[in-house]
Amino acid sequence: MKASSWRAGPRGRALAVCLVAAFMTGLDVSIVNVALPSIREGLHAMEDGLQWTLSGYALTFGLLLVPAGRLGDARSRRTLFMWGVVLFTLASVACGLAWNMNVLIVSRLLQGMAAGMLNPQVSGLIQQMFRGHERGRAFGALGATIGVSTAAGPLIGGALVTGFGPELGWRWVFLVNLPIGLALLPLAHRVLPTPDPAQLSGRRESMDPVGVLLLGLGVACLLLPFIQQHQWHGQAKWLLVPAALIVLAGFVAWERAYRREPLINLALFRKRSYSLGSAIALFYFAGFTGIFFTFTLYLQSGLDYSPLMAGLSITPFALGAASASVVGGRLVGRAGRRLVAAGLTIVIVGLCATMAATALVPGHDVGLATALPLLIAGVGSGLVISPNQAITLSEVPPAGGGSAAGVLQTGQRLGSSIGIAAVGSIFFSSLPQGWPTAFRHGLLVLLTCVSIALLAAGYDLIRTYRR
């Protein structure tokens, strides 16, 4: 079937609805960054409150991915999708109307829960609706959407804060989701595929509550010390990391013993495409997410850029990621993991060039000097995210697509949280040497993470050629 035929048909319309939802939830990962100074002034917020505005979303997002993916597989992805849209829209309105930091933090936690409900359904629906090269192209479109939403967040947030002013602008950063959510609901009800009753008749077993509890506790213990690194003083917080490993080991033991309907099919990790793809996603997201955090902070706080100008400066990355993701979705069926390795190499080249540009052109012209290097890094990113997701899920049966995607996305969220914490620690500890030096030291951390992802891709290629 020609690509144009399914794009214009029911599956194309359903994919469009899924992509809009993915854009909305991805946008809220980064759009808040440029609004933090306005939130601090408007709600008289302390640093720990601002940190929870960012990290609370990431925490509940990561906690819900696997259980929601499993529930969508077993019940109805369409139903979970629609409930996720409802909750995300209501939580966004609550964020926009928040009268103090406690209300904003709780609303952001709910917003993250809704995003965690939504995103596995998007991947699961793509697994359900598409096969072969069509699936690769659909994941290419999803990768472009994720890349653009994350990279465009600072630009859109900066435009809203600038356009509506510091007092109201930060509220519109959240309220912008209201019209999107209201438009999505009737469209989702109309175009998303309904589950086949015959297919679901034998899939209403237990949802493995013990597995849900163990995985949630393990992920929370692993994430908390990283996202609260600067607010939770002392070294005691790091005791949660070995505690998390013990809990997760208990989760694995339980899943192996639980024969009815385990939360995660551990046999997936015996497939090299899935295990290495998940590792690549974890380390790449640890590297690529931190660039938005450190660069916008450097531009706004170090060089006095306006929120809008800071957002514009990161736009080349978004443009490169969007264009390359579409191409990557078309090529992944032929090039496979070679495409991912090439993309990671291009990202490393782009980040090295960005580091050189900040050294050669210090001062207020940094935004212009880094435009081309960030465009190059964005092109590389577009060849990594969607092709890697398509390859990682290529051997997953459609019936388990939601839970498998939930595990993959949990790794992405975990990588993002660890990466931001690591780069933030190096960045802030280097500030006495100046903003440019702190930014370059932070980039070294990001380059290390991306390089580890490249090693994993290279190992997969070597194993493939030896077969």
Question: Can you name each region flagged by the protein language model?
Answer:
Residues 12-27, 32-34, 237, 260-467:
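12-transmembrane solute porter fold
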Residues 83, 135-148, 204-211, 270, ...:
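Cytoplasmic-side transmembrane-helix entry/capping segments in multi-pass membrane proteins
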Residues 1-10, 197-203, 460-467:
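Intrinsic disorder in cytosolic terminal tails and internal cytosolic loops
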Residues 50-51, 80, 138, 172-176, ...:
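Alpha-helical transmembrane segments of multi-pass secondary-active solute transporters
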Residues 47, 77, 101, 132, ...:
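Membrane-helix interface/capping residues of multi-pass secondary transporters
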Residues 87-97, 110, 114, 180-187, ...:
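Transmembrane-helix signature of multi-pass solute transporters
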Residues 162-279, 305, 313, 446-447:
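Hydrophobic transmembrane-helix bundles of small-molecule transporters
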Residues 1-190, 355, 425, 429:
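Transmembrane-helix bundle of Major Facilitator Superfamily
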